[in-house]
C-alpha cells in the first residue's frame, strides 16, 4: 500500500470507523489492523502446511467446546435475558401507545418526535401480538431447554432399565420435585414482574387521561366565564343601566369562585409538570438533539413567565393583583402555558421510553426495566393531576349545574306540597325566559356585527339593496325568541300574582293568631299633646323624675344578666348603688312631695298658655295635665302614687290651702333620718325645724321662719318673691354634702327660667287680687 493513500485508509473497529458508521458513510476502504503482519510473514517465510493444519484443528475444537459450553451453561442466562427483553419492549411499546392514543401531545411536539425518533410514532399504530406485554400463559409455556431435559430424562430411563428399581425412584422423585419447585419460583417472579409492569402502564394511562380531562375541563370553565361576561355585559347594555365602560370595569366579579379555582389548579399542575420535566432532563439525559434546551419551556425562569408562577406559595391578594383580578386574558395565558408544559412533559417521557433507548441484552437487568424510570420521574404528578381535577370539577359543577340541581326538585311533585309546585312553576318560567333571552342576545349580537360591517363598507347601492332582504329574514328569525320571551315573562308574572293573592288572603282572614310565643301585642297609644318647639322643656320635670326611686332591678332583665361576666356584674351593682345614693341626697335636698292637684297646678304654672296647642280641660284637670307630661314623669308618678295618697289624706295642720304652700324640709339629723323623710314625704313634728314659706308672707321676718313658726294664711296682697330669693333664704345645715349642694344649685337654676305665678280655683276675689299683683309688678 503506497504512502499517498494512507489518509484514505480506515481501520476496522477504530474510533474513526465507528464515527463514520454513525454518520452513515460506508463508501470508504476498510483495512484490518492484523492483516499486514500475516501478509508480511507469508511473503518472507513462505508457505508452511503443517502449522496451518494444526491451527485449523485447534480452531474447530475451540468452536465446538464454546458451542457446547454456551448451550449447556449459558442457556438459562439467555432465557432470562430474552424474557426481560420481552417485558422491557412490551412495556415501552404499550406506554408509547398510551401516550399517543390519549392525545396529550401538541402537533408541534408530534412533529418534533417524528424528527428525533420516528419509531415512537409507529408505536401508536395497532400493535401486533409481539408488541404487547407477554401474558401469563406465554410466560408459563415450557421452552426448548425444558423440553430437551424432559426428553433426556425419558431416554435415560429407557436406556438403563436398572433405573426402574424401586429404590432409585426416591432419588429421581426428589430431583424432579426440586426442579419443579425451582421452575415454579422462577415463574412466580416473572409473573410478579409482569403484573408490576401492567400496573404502572395502567397508572400512566390514568395520568394521561386525567391530564387530558383536566385540560378539557379548564377549557370549559374558561368558556363558561367568557359566556357569563358577554351575557352580563349584553344585558347591561340592553337595559341601559350603565355605560359599556362601567360594565367592563369589573369583569372579575362574575364567577369569582370558579376563576380562583381555575387559577389554583392550573398553577399547581403547571408547577408539577415543570418539576418532572426538569428532573428527566437532569437525571436521565439523552443525546444532544433531544436535550436541546431551546425545545423546552421548563428552562424558562419563572420571572419571565409572570402570573404569580413561582416555587413559593402566594396569597390570594397577591394572585389577584398579579392576574388583574383573575381576569379572563390572564387565565387564558396561564392555560396556554399549562397545555404547552403538559405536552412537553409527555414528549420527553416518550423519548425516554422509546425502544431505541432500551439497553442491550447482557446489560438489561430487572433494576433497569422502564417502570422504575416511570416511577422515579412521575412521583407526585398523578396525585397532583387527580386532586386538581377533582377540585376544579366540584367548582365547575357548582357554578354550571347549580340551577339544574335545584331544577331536579320538581321531579318529586307528587310528594311536595302545593307551594313547592307553584314555586317550581315560577322557576321553570324564569329559566325558560333566561334561555330565550340568551338565544335572542346571541342573534342580536350577530345581526349588530353584520350591520356594522354594512355601515363601514363602501358598497354600491345595488349590493346594499341585496342585503336588505337578508336583514329582513334575520329579523324574522329573531321574532320567535321575542314572542317566547314575552310568553315566559307573562307566565312568570301570573304565577307570582297567584302567590301574592294567596298570601294576602291568608293574612286577611280573621281569627288568625300569632303562633310565635315571643310576639306581644302592642297596646293602644293615647294621642299625645303636641307642644311647639319654642320654649325649652323645664328641667324641673327631669329633676322630679330623677328624685323618684325607680326600681331598676325589676326592669333589668335577668336573661341579659347571666350573659355578663363577673366584672360587668360587679360594675353594674356599684353603679346602681351609686345611683341610689345620689337619689337619696337629691331627695334630702329637694325633699317635697306634691299631690296630684299640686302637680296639676305646677304644670299649669310651668307651661305658658301659648305653648300648649290644645287647652287643658277644667273638668278633668289631672288627666289632661298627666297627658301633657313627658314619658319620664309617667313612670315617676307610678312609683310615687302611694306617697301622694298619704299626703292628700294627711295634710299639714293649720294649712287649709295646700295649693299656696311649698314645703322645704331641712333636718339636722343624720343620713338615715333624711332617707326616711325622703321616702315617706311627711313632716316630722317637733323633732326637726320646719320652715314654712308662704307666697304672701313677705312682711314676716326671716328669724321667725328659721324658728319654724307657722302662721295662718293671710290674704295675698303682696308681691310674689322670686324662687331664687326664697332658695337664698334657706339656712343649710353643716352636714350638707357637696353633691347635695350641687343638686340644689341645679334646682335653683332650673326653677329660675320663669316667674312663677300662682293660680287657685273657685275663688274669684283671689283671682282679682292676683291680677292686681301682676299689674303692680309690671309697673315696677
UniProtKB/Swiss-Prot annotation:
Stretches with biased composition (Low complexity)? 702-711
Q: What segments bear the compositional bias annotation Acidic residues?
A: 761-780
* Region annotation (Disordered) ranges: 620-718, 757-780
Q: Which GO terms describe its cellular component?
A: acrosomal vesicle; adherens junction; glutamatergic synapse; nucleus; plasma membrane; postsynapse; stereocilia ankle link complex; stereocilium membrane
Which GO terms fall under molecular function for this chain's record? Answer: myosin binding
Disruption of the gene: reported phenotype: Embryos die at the time of implantation because of a defect in intercellular adhesion.
Q: Where is the composition biased (Basic and acidic residues)?
A: 647-663, 690-699
Mode of membrane association: Multi-pass membrane protein
**Where is the major localization of this protein?**
membrane
Report, as the record phrases it, the tissue specificity of this protein. Answer: Expressed in developing cochlear hair cells. Isoform 1, isoform 2 and isoform 3 are expressed in testis. In the seminiferous epithelium, present exclusively in the acrosome of spermatids (at protein level).
Is Nucleotidyltransferase tagged as a keyword?
A: no
Q: Which UniProt keywords apply?
A: Cell junction, Cell membrane, Cell projection, Coiled coil, Cytoplasmic vesicle, Developmental protein, Membrane, Nucleus, Transmembrane, Transmembrane helix
A Gene Ontology biological process in which this protein takes part is: chordate embryonic development
Q: What InterPro entries does the record point to?
A: Myosin-bd, Vezatin
Biased composition range(s): Polar residues: 624-643
Where, per UniProt, does this protein localize?
Cell membrane; Cell projection, Stereocilium membrane; Cell junction, Adherens junction; Nucleus
Presence of keyword Cell cycle = no
- Coiled coil spans: 430-467
Subunit info here reads: Interacts with USH2A (via the cytoplasmic region); the interaction associates VEZT with the USH2 complex at the stereocilia base. Interacts with myosin MYO7A and the cadherin-catenins complex.
Report the protein's function: Plays a pivotal role in the establishment of adherens junctions and their maintenance in adult life. Required for morphogenesis of the preimplantation embryo, and for the implantation process.
Q: Which PANTHER family match?
A: VEZATIN
The family annotation for this protein states: Belongs to the vezatin family.
Provide the protein name.
Answer: Vezatin
Q: Which organism is it from?
A: Mus musculus
Amino acid at each position: 500500500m503506497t504512502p499517498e493513500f494512507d489518509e484514505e485508509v480506515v481501520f476496522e473497529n477504530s474510533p474513526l470507523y465507528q464515527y463514520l458508521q454513525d454518520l452513515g458513510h460506508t463508501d470508504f476502504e476498510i483495512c484490518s489492523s492484523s492483516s499486514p503482519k500475516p501478509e508480511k510473514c507469508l511473503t518472507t517465510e513462505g508457505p508452511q502446511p503443517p502449522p496451518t493444519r494444526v491451527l485449523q484443528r485447534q480452531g474447530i475444537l475451540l468452536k465446538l467446546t464454546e458451542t457446547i459450553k454456551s448451550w449447556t451453561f449459558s442457556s438459562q442466562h439467555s432465557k432470562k435475558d430474552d424474557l426481560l427483553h420481552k417485558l422491557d419492549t412490551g412495556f415501552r411499546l404499550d406506554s408509547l401507545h398510551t401516550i399517543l392514543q390519549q392525545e396529550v401531545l401538541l402537533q408541534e411536539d408530534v412533529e418534533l418526535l417524528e424528527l428525533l425518533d420516528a419509531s415512537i410514532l409507529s408505536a401508536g399504530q395497532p400493535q401486533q401480538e409481539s408488541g404487547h406485554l407477554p401474558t401469563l400463559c406465554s410466560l408459563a409455556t415450557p421452552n426448548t431447554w425444558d423440553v430437551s431435559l424432559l426428553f433426556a430424562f425419558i431416554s435415560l430411563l429407557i436406556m438403563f432399565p436398572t433405573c426402574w428399581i424401586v429404590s432409585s425412584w426416591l432419588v429421581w422423585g426428589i430431583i424432579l420435585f426440586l426442579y419443579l419447585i425451582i421452575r415454579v419460583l422462577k415463574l412466580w417472579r416473572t409473573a410478579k414482574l409482569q403484573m408490576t409492569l401492567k400496573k404502572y402502564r395502567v397508572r400512566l394511562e390514568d395520568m394521561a387521561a386525567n391530564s387530558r380531562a383536566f385540560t378539557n375541563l379548564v377549557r370549559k370553565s374558561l368558556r363558561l366565564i367568557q359566556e357569563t361576561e358577554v351575557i352580563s355585559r349584553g344585558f347591561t347594555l340592553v337595559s341601559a343601566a350603565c355605560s359599556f365602560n362601567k360594565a367592563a370595569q369589573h369583569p372579575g366579579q362574575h364567577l369569582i369562585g370558579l376563576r380562583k379555582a381555575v387559577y389554583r389548579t392550573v398553577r399547581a399542575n403547571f408547577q408539577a409538570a415543570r418539576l418532572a420535566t426538569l428532573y428527566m432532563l437532569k437525571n436521565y439525559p439523552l443525546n444532544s438533539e433531544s436535550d436541546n434546551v431551546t425545545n423546552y419551556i421548563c428552562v424558562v425562569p419563572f420571572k419571565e413567565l409572570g402570573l404569580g408562577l413561582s416555587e413559593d406559595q402566594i396569597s390570594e391578594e397577591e394572585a389577584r393583583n398579579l392576574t388583574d383580578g383573575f381576569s379572563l386574558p390572564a387565565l387564558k395565558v396561564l392555560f396556554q402555558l399549562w397545555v404547552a408544559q403538559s405536552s412537553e412533559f409527555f414528549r420527553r417521557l416518550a423519548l425516554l421510553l422509546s425502544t431505541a433507548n432500551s439497553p442491550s441484552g447482557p446489560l438489561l437487568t430487572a433494576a433497569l426495566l422502564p417502570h422504575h424510570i416511570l416511577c422515579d420521574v412521575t412521583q407526585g404528578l398523578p396525585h397532583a393531576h387527580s386532586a386538581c381535577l377533582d377540585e376544579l370539577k366540584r367548582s365547575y359543577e357548582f357554578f354550571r349545574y347549580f340551577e339544574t340541581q335545584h331544577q331536579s326538585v320538581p321531579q318529586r311533585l307528587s310528594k311536595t306540597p302545593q307551594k313547592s309546585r307553584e314555586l317550581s312553576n315560577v322557576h321553570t318560567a324564569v329559566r325558560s325566559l333566561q334561555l330565550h333571552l340568551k338565544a335572542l342576545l346571541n342573534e342580536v349580537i350577530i345581526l349588530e356585527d353584520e350591520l356594522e360591517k354594512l355601515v363601514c363598507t363602501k358598497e354600491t347601492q345595488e349590493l346594499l339593496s341585496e342585503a336588505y332582504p337578508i336583514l329582513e329574514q334575520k329579523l324574522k328569525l329573531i321574532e320567535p325568541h321575542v314572542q317566547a320571551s314575552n310568553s315566559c315573562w307573562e307566565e312568570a308574572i301570573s304565577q307570582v300574582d297567584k302567590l301574592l293573592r294567596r298570601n294576602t288572603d291568608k293574612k286577611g282572614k280573621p281569627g288568625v293568631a300569632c303562633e310565635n310565643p315571643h310576639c306581644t301585642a302592642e297596646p293602644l297609644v293615647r294621642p299625645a299633646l303636641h307642644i311647639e318647639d319654642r320654649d325649652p322643656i323645664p328641667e324641673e320635670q327631669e329633676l322630679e323624675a330623677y328624685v323618684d326611686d325607680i326600681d331598676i332591678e325589676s326592669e333589668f332583665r335577668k336573661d341579659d344578666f347571666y350573659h355578663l361576666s363577673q366584672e360587668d356584674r360587679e360594675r353594674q351593682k356599684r353603679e346602681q348603688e351609686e345611683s341610689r345614693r345620689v337619689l337619696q341626697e337629691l331627695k334630702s335636698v329637694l325633699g317635697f312631695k306634691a299631690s296630684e292637684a299640686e302637680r296639676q297646678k305646677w304644670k299649669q304654672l310651668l307651661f305658658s298658655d301659648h305653648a300648649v296647642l290644645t287647652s287643658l280641660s277644667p273638668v278633668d284637670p289631672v288627666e289632661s295635665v298627666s297627658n301633657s307630661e313627658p314619658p319620664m314623669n309617667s313612670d315617676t308618678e307610678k312609683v310615687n302614687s302611694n306617697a301622694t295618697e298619704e299626703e292628700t289624706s294627711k295634710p299639714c295642720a293649720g294649712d287649709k290651702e295646700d295649693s299656696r304652700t311649698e314645703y322645704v324640709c331641712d333636718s339636722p339629723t343624720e343620713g338615715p333620718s333624711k332617707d326616711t323623710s325622703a321616702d315617706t314625704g311627711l313632716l316630722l313634728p317637733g323633732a326637726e325645724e320646719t320652715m314654712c314659706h308662704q307666697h304672701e308672707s313677705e312682711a314676716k321676718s326671716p328669724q321667725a321662719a328659721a324658728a319654724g313658726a307657722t302662721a295662718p294664711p293671710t290674704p295675698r296682697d303682696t308681691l310674689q318673691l322670686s324662687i331664687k330669693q326664697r332658695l337664698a333664704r334657706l339656712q343649710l345645715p353643716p352636714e350638707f354634702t357637696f353633691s347635695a349642694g350641687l343638686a340644689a344649685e341645679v334646682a335653683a337654676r332650673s326653677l329660675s327660667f320663669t316667674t312663677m305665678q300662682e293660680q287657685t280655683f273657685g275663688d274669684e276675689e283671689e283671682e282679682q287680687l292676683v291680677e292686681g299683683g301682676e299689674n303692680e309688678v309690671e309697673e315696677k
